[in-house]
Every structure is written in C-alpha cells, then in structure tokens.
C-alpha cells in the first residue's frame, strides 16, 4: 500500500516533543556552510526503512512532517519488496526536488532475515549517495504510535513493546513515558511473574506482535494491552530526527543490526 499524504507536523515541535525534553530544536542542530542551524534543519529529509517483522515499510519525513509512506502487509517477502519500495520513495523525493539527507533503519531485534535485508538496503543507499546512517531500536519505534494515540497515559506508566519470538518468548524492553530506558532489551520467557516488579508499582502497557500470546498469562490488575501496534517506517521519524539533530550516526561500513540472538536455521522436513 502506497500512501502519499499531506504534511502532518506532529514530530519534534509537536505532540512528541516531550519525548526528549532536554533537547531544544535550534541548539542541537549542526551548522553547515552557508546555513544557520534552523535553515539546515528545515531542509533535512530522511528515508526510513523498517523490516524487522513480516511487514515491510518505507517512509520519507521532512522537518517534522511525514510526506510519504508505503507498507506491505502481505508476508515476509522483503527481499523482493524492500528495494522496490525504497526506490519508489527516492523517486518521489526526486520528483518533488527534495534531496534526501540521511537514511534511518530499524536496528532490531526482530526477524534475522528481515533485519539483514533492511540493513543491507540502508547501507547500500548510504554508500551510493554518501549519506549518513541512523539506527533506531525497533522497540522504540513501536512506542511512538502508543504515545501519539494515548497521550492520556498516567505519568508513571511504563511501556513494554514486545516482538514475537518462539513459543512463549518475546524480545522486550521497558520504557517510561519519555522513552527513557527502565530495562534494556532482552529475550523474555513470559510467565505470570515475569514483569511483576514493574506491575506492582506501575501501570504497565504491553503491545507489539508478541503481546497477544501474553494476555492470558499476565493477569495482574496493572497490566494493560494495546492491540494493533507494529513497528512501521512512518513512526520512525520523530526518533530519527532527534538522532539527526544530535549527529548520532552509524558507520555504514560496519553497522550490523541488533539480532539479540544468533540465527538458528530450521531443518527442512522434506526428504532430499
């Protein structure tokens, strides 16, 4: 699904500005020759690539606006779709005379193959166009739509984005409402008491494609589940633009996604 949308400004200077209250817009922008920090930021356009789950998505943002996004929900065919979708986004930018200034990629954890495809695509574009690379942790990407759609969350709420792994295992992290890390990303075997230390003290919101299988296991009264949350490229831009302002870039030559676990190849059941 390709969507070209009118500008929507709800990023750095809008509804998500509280995600990083210590950063001011002007002070953190690098100066470039002939441009003030504000002028330089106004020109910045970022290509976003997200391939950590079965959904493949790309997006373009500029100055806190989401200007283009495309999503493919038809299953894990990233090797076919990712390049086509990225090229379509770059063509859109070119046709509107918008120079792309950086590439942001979802850094994991998630699908080993999906992450590898997305990282390879992002690195290739960065290398070919001499662009900086930005890496955004996948759990943080999932937090963005939650904070946008649920701005009435209690001040002491904790967010637990979950990516489905095998059986009752999930890749999860714990954040507060300002996306400060309460607990680092880890692989959790979900049982009734897995998050008890947080649930006893805070309302905790679970979401992501790994949360559905946890609903019947985690029955604490402080546990809340939010459906329909996936890591999508269109939700990367508030975080990517913060990284752009900070100059928080990766070395494209050596960047590797955060797989969390080593790849395990499944044995085919078919007789050779």
What are these regions (language model features)?
Residues 3-4, 10, 15-18, 24-26, ...:
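Short, positively charged and aromatic/hydrophobic N-terminal segments
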Residues 41-42, 65, 74-77, 132-231, ...:
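Surface "functional belts" at beta-alpha junctions
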Residues 41-109:
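N-terminal beta-alpha supersecondary unit
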Residues 89-93, 128, 146, 236-244:
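Stable alpha-helical structural segments in soluble proteins, enriched in small hydrophobic residues
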Residues 104-138:
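DPxDG-like acidic metal-binding loop motif
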Residues 226-272:
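Acyltransferase
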């Amino acid at each position: 699904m390709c969507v070209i949308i009118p500008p929507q400004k709800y990023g750095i200077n809008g509804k998500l500005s509280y995600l990083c209250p210590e950063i001011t817009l002007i002070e953190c922008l690098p100066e470039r020759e002939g441009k003030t920090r504000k002028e330089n930021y106004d020109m910045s356009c970022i290509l976003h690539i997200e391939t950590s789950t079965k959904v493949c998505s790309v997006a373009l943002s500029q100055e806190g606006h989401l200007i283009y996004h495309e999503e493919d929900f038809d299953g894990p065919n990233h090797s076919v779709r990712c390049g086509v979708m990225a090229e379509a986004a770059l063509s859109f930018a070119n046709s509107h005379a918008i120079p792309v200034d950086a590439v942001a990629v979802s850094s994991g954890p998630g699908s080993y193959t999906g992450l590898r495809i997305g990282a390879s695509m992002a690195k290739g574009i960065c290398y070919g166009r001499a662009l900086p690379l930005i890496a955004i942790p996948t759990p943080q990407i999932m937090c963005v739509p939650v904070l946008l759609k649920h701005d009435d969350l209690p001040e002491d709420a904790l967010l637990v984005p979950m990516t489905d792994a095998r059986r009752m295992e999930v890749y999860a992290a714990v954040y507060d409402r300002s996306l400060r890390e309460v607990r680092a990303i880890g692989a959790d075997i979900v049982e009734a008491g897995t998050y008890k230390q947080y649930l006893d003290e805070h309302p905790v919101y679970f979401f992501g494609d790994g949360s559905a299988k946890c609903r019947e296991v985690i029955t604490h009264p402080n546990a809340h589940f939010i459906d329909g949350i996936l890591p999508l490229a269109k939700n990367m831009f508030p975080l990517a633009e913060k990284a752009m302002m900070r100059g928080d870039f990766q070395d494209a030559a050596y960047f590797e996604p955060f797989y969390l676990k080593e790849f395990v190849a499944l044995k085919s059941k078919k007789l050779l």
